[in-house]
C-alpha cells in the first residue's frame, strides 16, 4: 500500500491526521536533521496503523516534507 504524507517536523503538538484531499499530515517533535523526523514518522505510522516498523519505508521525499510511504502488508 502506498500513500502520500506531509510531515511537520519540530512541532509543539504531535498528531496524525487525514486531510480532505486524502493526504496524511503527521506532526512530530523531532527536527528535520540527520533523519530524526523520518524515524519519528515511521514510528508514528507504525503505532497508528499497528504495523511493524520493518514493513514501512519511505519511497521518495527523504529530504522533503512531502513523502511517499509504502507499507508491505
From Swiss-Prot:
It comes from Leptospira interrogans serogroup Icterohaemorrhagiae serovar Lai (strain 56601). This is UPF0235 protein LA_1736. Pfam families: DUF167. It comes from the Bacteria. Belongs to the UPF0235 family. The lineage of its organism: Bacteria, Pseudomonadati, Spirochaetota, Spirochaetia, Leptospirales. NCBIfam families: DUF167 family protein. InterPro entries: DUF167, YggU-like_sf. SUPFAM superfamilies: YggU-like.
Amino acid at each position: 500500500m502506498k500513500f502520500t504524507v506531509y510531515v511537520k517536523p519540530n512541532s509543539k503538538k504531535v498528531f496524525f491526521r487525514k486531510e480532505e484531499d486524502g493526504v496524511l499530515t503527521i506532526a512530530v517533535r523531532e527536527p528535520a536533521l540527520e533523519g530524526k523526523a523520518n524515524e519519528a514518522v515511521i514510528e508514528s505510522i507504525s503505532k497508528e496503523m499497528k504495523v511493524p516498523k520493518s514493513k514501512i519505508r519511505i519511497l521518495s521525499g527523504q529530504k522533503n516534507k512531502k513523502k511517499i510511504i509504502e507499507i508491505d502488508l
